[in-house]
Amino acid sequence: MSQQHTLPVTLSPALSQELLKTVPPPVNTQQEQMKQPTPLPPPCQKMPVELPVEVPSKQEEKHMTAVKGLPEQECEQQQQEPQEQELQQQHWEQHEEYQKAENPEQQLKQEKAQRDPQLNKQLEEEKKLLDQQLDQELVKRDEQLGMKKEQLLELPEQQEGHLKHLEQREGQLELPEQQEGQLKHLEQQKGQLELPEQQEGQLELPEQQEGQLKHLEQQEGQLKHLEHQEGQLEVPEEQVGQLKYLEQQEGQLKHLDQQEKQPELPEQQVGQLKHLEQQEGQPKHLEQQKGQLEHLEEQEGQLKHLEQQEGQLEHLEHQEGQLGLPEQQVQQLKQLEKEEGQPKHLEEEEGQLKHLVQQEGQLEHLVQQEGQLEHLVQQEGQLEQQEGQVEHLEQQVEHLEQLGQLKHLEEQEGQLKHLEQQQGQLGVPEQVGQPKNLEQEEKQLELPEQQEGQLKHLEKQEAQLELPEQQVGQPKHLEQQEKQLEPPEQQDGQLKHLEQQEGQLKDLEQQKGQLEQPVFAPAPGQVQDIQSALPTKGEVLLPLEHQQQKQEVQWPPKHK
């Protein structure tokens, strides 16, 4: 019985420990055991199925007492049954542990299946939010860009008005003749203030000097007022930088507009434009260097002015030591020296304004050069179109030359037909061996309908090749434009090519004149001579003179 109910289940100890850790606490195992009872022998069916793992000794005694009347073999079987039940319980426990070890994977799968839709929903919501945020940011950026463009378009107008106002102020700052006279008067007064050596011992100033000092104070007030006006007129550095930046942006916008209007330029023009851009960049670099040099020159002028002021101060201190002037006059003299340095500052500002005017002139010159470039580009496009027409004409001429022989064959066919008609009228006896040869030659000379269509097409092309008077006058204009834009070697090659085309056209006209000449009817004795002159397969057509000579030599004798 024990061999029938035991099943071999082997699990590694490591797996069993891991599974026991992860698996939740087991459900009542006794209920599952009740569902699947083990079969027992008939005398022992009254025994309870539920047995603990460790059977106490008291139960064994009870079992022994309950089954006293049975034979010893049955009692031994009953004693072995608890052991079998214990083995079955161990087996069921192992089986349950194995099932529980498999269940976590299923639980994980179920949890994943439940979590996946939730995660997908969350991701979709987050994506929607991000899309909305991006759309809002794009709208904001577009609005900001539109505002900036409007501001940039409005700034030049404001700055133009500001520049006009500055120019008016500059006109006001130009000192009139009266102020120049006042400055000269001040210099004279300074000269008068330098007292001679005789007045060294005199400390008290006369009444005239006191009046002069009052006059100097009034002039100092006027100079301060002028300084205040100059301070208002000084353009801040930020506005200057904004003006330069706006000019650069305007230049870039013009350049982009021109690029959009212009077609794709050839490689040569692209190189020229790059070279021009480099040249345009060079003036800016030179302007920066000039500005630096001017700044250095201004600094040198300031240093020289300071040295002069130091020399004047030393001279004044020497005079003060001699004259013993009070401290108030010393301060007044220093203020006068400062006021004299202000006109130089105004002159420097005027020089900067002149420099800006020169830069504007240079920009206008560059704009004119760009317009010239556009005109050159248009001329080059016209030249390319005309060159394409010339190439098309060359191809047509070559095609005509190839098919010129077909016309010659047609003319020979016409002559043969005319000769055949004359033969029929004259009743010349036909030779016996000639009909087959004549039929072969006629088959060779019969042109298909395709050749006739080609001849018609050639006639149309010849009509197109007849250049009108306007096209005859165009090559001269083209030659002048090509001399301006192309190197001399290319011009020589194109002129030679045009001369060759003219020569080919003249040759075609001569051939037409020859073909239009009338065909004379031969005498009765010469009818068969012309038939023998027709070329067979492999022979080459010869001029008419050589053919006539061969006809006289190769004429076969008549059969009587």
UniProtKB/Swiss-Prot annotation:
The protein's role, per its UniProt record: Part of the insoluble cornified cell envelope (CE) of stratified squamous epithelia.
Name of the gene this protein is made from: IVL
Lineage of the species this protein comes from: Eukaryota, Metazoa, Chordata, Craniata, Vertebrata
UniProt tissue specificity: Keratinocytes of epidermis and other stratified squamous epithelia.
Protein's UniProt keywords contain DNA-binding: no
Sequence similarity: Belongs to the involucrin family.
BP terms from Gene Ontology: keratinization; keratinocyte differentiation; peptide cross-linking; response to UV-B
InterPro entries found in the cross-reference section: Involucrin_CS, Involucrin_N, Involucrin_rpt, LRR_dom_sf
Biased composition (Basic and acidic residues): 92-115, 159-172, 212-231, 252-264, 274-320, 335-353, 404-420, 454-463, 476-486, 494-510
Low complexity bias (residue ranges): 76-91, 189-211, 321-334
Quaternary assembly: Directly or indirectly cross-linked to cornifelin (CNFN).
Post-translational modification as stated in the protein's UniProt record: Substrate of transglutaminase. Specific glutamines or lysines are cross-linked to keratins, desmoplakin and to inter involucrin molecules.
Domain of life: Eukaryota
Protein name: Involucrin
